[in-house]
Amino acid sequence: QVLNAVNYGVPQNRERLITIGHKSSFTYPTTELTKVLVKEAIGDTMNIEVEGSKILTPAQDKYIAAYEEKSHCVRPRDLYPDKPARTLTCRNLAGATSDMHRVLLPDGRRRRITQREAARLQSFPDWFEFSGNETQQFTQIGNAVPPLLAYKLALAIKETYEQPTKTDEEITE
């Protein structure tokens, strides 16, 4: 079944095909009605110049604007406080310019999100540590299944295994 992480408490639209193999029926987790927004995950950092963040130069901003115009980009990678984020991937997190996720600072400059902000948008707790250099950390974050989605899937799997099972004969009847 295709699940969108935004429906399970993750502040990001992230659709993934999840396959659960089980002899009897399996019920996927119930979706949540309210969506977690970017400002709820990174609102404390998105309006400031965070240590370790990369501010786009005027040349990079110009390049991005030209790229988005030429590619008829209707959904740029800017993060909007009142919406869930677009899908984070290892490619668009560590990218140098055009495809990276970025926040708009109050003074009009834009900066790339930090590893910690990306991790929060994936639902990792702040205490979780990633290893390696910046690119390796962004790769780990971008390739990960959001922990909140994984947790809710694990609960559904646990619930399935705690139910009484039918015998092969009962299933074929």
Residue ranges and their predicted role:
Residues 1-81:
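Class I S-adenosyl-L-methionine
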Residues 48, 52-173:
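C-terminal target-recognition/interaction regions appended to catalytic cores
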